[in-house]
């Protein structure tokens, strides 16, 4: 099973901006590693939440399309809300 997500570059940083994203059904994330700079991105919460229900999401290489460029990544860390079934933040590491 392969996973491919469309992402936007996130320009607004900080707690308030992240809360606004989550309120709008999006989740903040970051892609880092390799020789390229780290990129803060925005993903659709429901698509990622549905995908993470599969074990393959954690073990396989994922494809994230950011500004027309495909990034091959693996999940490095996921932060979840303590009482709600919501994702708070994701970290991806480039392959």
From Swiss-Prot:
GO biological process: translation
Subunit and partners: Part of the 50S ribosomal subunit; part of the 5S rRNA/L5/L18/L25 subcomplex. Contacts the 5S rRNA. Binds to the 5S rRNA independently of L5 and L18.
Species per Swiss-Prot/TrEMBL record: Glaesserella parasuis serovar 5 (strain SH0165) (Haemophilus parasuis)
Family: Belongs to the bacterial ribosomal protein bL25 family.
Record Pfam families: Ribosomal_L25p (PF01386)
Annotated GO CC locations: cytosolic large ribosomal subunit
InterPro entries: Rbsml_bL25/Gln-tRNA_synth_N (IPR020056), Ribosomal_bL25/Gln-tRNA_synth (IPR011035), Ribosomal_bL25_short (IPR020055), Ribosomal_L25_dom (IPR029751), Ribosomal_uL5_bac-type (IPR020930)
Keyword Ribosomal protein annotated: yes
GO MF, one annotated term: 5S rRNA binding
Keywords: Ribonucleoprotein, Ribosomal protein, RNA-binding, rRNA-binding
Stated name of the protein: Large ribosomal subunit protein bL25
Organism lineage string: Bacteria, Pseudomonadati, Pseudomonadota, Gammaproteobacteria, Pasteurellales
Role: This is one of the proteins that binds to the 5S RNA in the ribosome where it forms part of the central protuberance.
